[in-house]
């Protein structure tokens, strides 16, 4: 019988971290071996008790390198799932790769230069790494539908809406959507007039191939995206709404299982489906 995949969760007490702990505990082929969080008031506490599952015998620690070192000694190839913060994610991934622990990154905010550097580092180390801005299967389907629609429309804008604790804007999912549309090799939104913003930023950020991205941050939201196409006489709106973070867990578990089979960095859930 195969041994379960050892998994460390970094950002274990955050919203996504808690859902990931629950998903790992419920799965038969993965096992939680580490839980990392920065908050001083949870150090040493059982992560199972914190998330409401009862004892899992996994104490919370803030020692990332120490936990990566321990995980690297597991019989099976270990994985670290990271839901932390844009300010530390680059260093977190480099440390994981250095210890041979396969990173599954749900934290957004990495820029293109950082992604390229991490890709080169992972390739040299022959370590698989997955950077996934959105783990929802429905979101992947929205992106694919947007690609099909963009063949017939020259005008498109992206609206992304998230909870008010999200640190980066625009979201990694919106950027990924714009990048996928831009890969078609066409320039969108040919100008009709000379625009003048009376308030800077009113028309949103200009992404690749002139695709504008608009960000909303409000309490009450979780994660939502609209891709809006326009043509004379009609509007086509594609929308995905996250109602509960549990919708991400099938994608998270899929990534945990897949990343150990890879060498190098892959960006986007669509690349492993």
Swiss-Prot record:
Subcellular locations according to the entry: Cytoplasm
A Pfam family the protein falls into: DapB_N
Positions that bind NAD(+): 11-16, 106-108
Enzyme class: oxidoreductase
Domain of life: Bacteria
Pathway involvement of the protein, from the record: Amino-acid biosynthesis; L-lysine biosynthesis via DAP pathway; (S)-tetrahydrodipicolinate from L-aspartate: step 4/4
This protein's UniProt keywords: Amino-acid biosynthesis, Cytoplasm, Diaminopimelate biosynthesis, Lysine biosynthesis, NAD, NADP, Oxidoreductase
One of the GO biological process terms: lysine biosynthetic process via diaminopimelate
Alphabetized GO MF terms: 4-hydroxy-tetrahydrodipicolinate reductase; NAD binding; NADP binding; oxidoreductase activity, acting on CH or CH2 groups, NAD or NADP as acceptor
Cellular component GO terms, alphabetical: cytosol
InterPro entries xrefs: DapB_C (IPR022663), DapB_N (IPR000846), DapB_N_CS (IPR022664), DHDPR_bac (IPR023940), NAD(P)-bd_dom_sf (IPR036291)
EC number in record: 1.17.1.8
Family annotation (HAMAP family): DapB
Family according to the record: Belongs to the DapB family.
Name the record gives this protein: 4-hydroxy-tetrahydrodipicolinate reductase
Primary gene name: dapB
